[in-house]
A protein has these predicted regions:
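Non-catalytic, surface-exposed connector residues within folded enzymatic/regulatory domains
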Residues: 103, 146-149, 165-168, 188, ...
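Conserved non-catalytic scaffold segment of RNase H-like nuclease domains
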Residues: 13-150, 173-184, 232-238
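Acidic two-metal-ion nuclease catalytic site recognized across multiple nuclease folds
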Residues: 1-30, 199-240
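Short alpha-helix plus adjacent loop in nuclease-associated cores
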Residues: 152-168
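Acidic, Mg2+-coordinating catalytic module of metal-dependent nucleases/exonucleases
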Residues: 121-128, 132-133, 137-138, 170-232
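A broadly conserved amphipathic alpha-helix scaffold signal in soluble, globular proteins
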Residues: 114, 160, 199-202
Length: 240
């Protein structure tokens, strides 16, 4: 067997093992109640909005939820993006080049972030944005592998599944309409938005429980319904 064939077989095997591990992880969590689950609500700030244009993470934060309560366990790190921060992004999150130039790159925080995420369900608002940036900012690391295989809940989809009639699922709109406290947090900071999203998430879990949805599997089903609503809303906006 030549080396190219061996590499291809190893690649296929690794892909298969990753897919298998993902579904084993999903199935393991499906029957677990939200009460017994540990959640990490994640948020990032970046140098720009397009990961494919070379934009990277400048700040990452996580808020841990246990027993359906926000804990004091937090992750809050400035990150050296190893590239320039756009002026537009600085206007939004107020993180300057000077603040991050001596901070660790995301890959250097690999163990710290991985340990924080271990045995948790990952939550975020437009979470796929954060996941893509983590994978691009720290490729071939344990955290990149972790976020590819972890159970995830996007509060956009969960909110759409519970409140299908809302005209928007933007974080500020949801917090205003659902009376989620935000005044004590700094918006567009990774930690501030993480805490606010955690509060929103707990509200959504409470509303889900009123529909007798109390397992991770049930929450994922609501998210899937919400995702379909999001797709329909986008299609409707394209038509009109």
């Amino acid at each position: 067997m030549n080396s190219r064939q061996e590499r291809e077989e190893i690649l296929v095997k690794n892909i298969f093992n990753n897919i298998k591990a993902y579904f084993v992880n999903i199935n393991r969590h499906k029957k677990i109640t939200t009460q017994k689950s540990i959640f990490v609500v994640l948020d990032t700030e970046t140098t720009g909005l397009d990961v494919n244009e070379g934009h990277r993470i400048v700040s990452i934060a996580g808020t841990k939820i246990k027993n359906l309560k926000i804990t004091n366990e937090i992750l809050d790190e400035l990150v050296n993006p190893e590239c320039q921060i756009s002026e537009r992004s600085i206007e939004i999150h107020h993180i300057t080049q000077e603040q991050v130039e001596n901070k660790p790159a995301l890959k250097e925080l690999d163990n710290k972030i991985y340990n924080f995420l271990e045995d948790t369900v990952l939550v975020g608002h437009n979470l796929n944005f954060d996941i893509k940036f983590i994978i691009k900012s720290a490729p071939y690391t344990t955290i990149a592998h972790r976020v590819k295989n972890i159970v995830t809940i996007d509060t956009i989809y969960l909110a759409a599944g519970i409140y299908p009639h809302f005209k928007s699922y933007e974080l500020s709109f949801l917090c205003e309409n659902l009376k989620i406290q935000t005044e004590d947090q700094t918006r567009h900071s990774a930690l501030g938005d993480s805490v606010i999203t955690a509060r929103l998430f707990l509200h959504l879990l409470e509303e889900a429980s009123k529909k007798n949805v109390t397992t991770i599997g049930g929450i994922l089903h609501l998210c899937q319904q919400g995702k379909q609503i999001q797709i329909l809303m986008k299609d409707f906006n394209k038509i009109h």
